[in-house]
Amino acid sequence: MYTRTVRLQDTDAAGVVYFTSALDICHEAFEDSLMGAGIDIRTFFSNPDTATPIIHADIDFLKPSFCGDQLTLQLSTHQLAEDEFEVRYNITAVNKGERLIAKATIRHVCINPINRQRQPLPKELVTWIQRWSLAMS
């Protein structure tokens, strides 16, 4: 579980969390879970042989979130193919009685960064996916 305080920079002119900021916060939770599994994210994200770009992202807002809100993100992973996975996020506001305020899905594909061709997920990522695959089941 990842915890994050909504900052002013995360909000739009209406004072609520901007959709791209919410997706950024989801990516922070992704990075945090990789580190929690013992993956060195500096090495992981700068690997010259493997990249995992985002190919799809969506988010549904169920309730607004504002500057100062304490958010928790619970994630679960799903391997879709030998070269593709997605991460699903449930976002709750702690200061609002643990109310579910948003759900997001971010899908990644594994590629060779030189030729941009799909390739199988690295073993450490498959292990991470298996670890988190039952988190929200």
Curated annotation (Swiss-Prot):
It comes from the Bacteria. InterPro entries: 4-hydroxybenzoyl-CoA_TE (IPR050563), DHNA_CoA_hydrolase (IPR022829), HotDog_dom_sf (IPR029069). GO terms for biological process: phylloquinone biosynthetic process. Keywords: Hydrolase. The keyword Hydrolase applies. It catalyses: 1,4-dihydroxy-2-naphthoyl-CoA + H2O = 1,4-dihydroxy-2-naphthoate + CoA + H(+). The active site is at D12. Gene3D superfamilies: Hotdog Thioesterase. It holds the Pfam family 4HBT_2. One of its GO terms (molecular function) is 1,4-dihydroxy-2-naphthoyl-CoA thioesterase activity. Pathway: Cofactor biosynthesis; phylloquinone biosynthesis; Quinol/quinone metabolism; 1,4-dihydroxy-2-naphthoate biosynthesis; 1,4-dihydroxy-2-naphthoate from chorismate: step 7/7. Its EC number is 3.1.2.28. Catalyzes the hydrolysis of 1,4-dihydroxy-2-naphthoyl-CoA (DHNA-CoA) to 1,4-dihydroxy-2-naphthoate (DHNA), a reaction involved in phylloquinone (vitamin K1) biosynthesis. Belongs to the 4-hydroxybenzoyl-CoA thioesterase family. DHNA-CoA hydrolase subfamily. PANTHER family: 4-HYDROXYBENZOYL-COA THIOESTERASE FAMILY MEMBER, ACYL-COA THIOESTER HYDROLASE YBGC. This is 1,4-dihydroxy-2-naphthoyl-CoA hydrolase. The lineage of its organism: Bacteria, Bacillati, Cyanobacteriota, Cyanophyceae, Acaryochloridales.
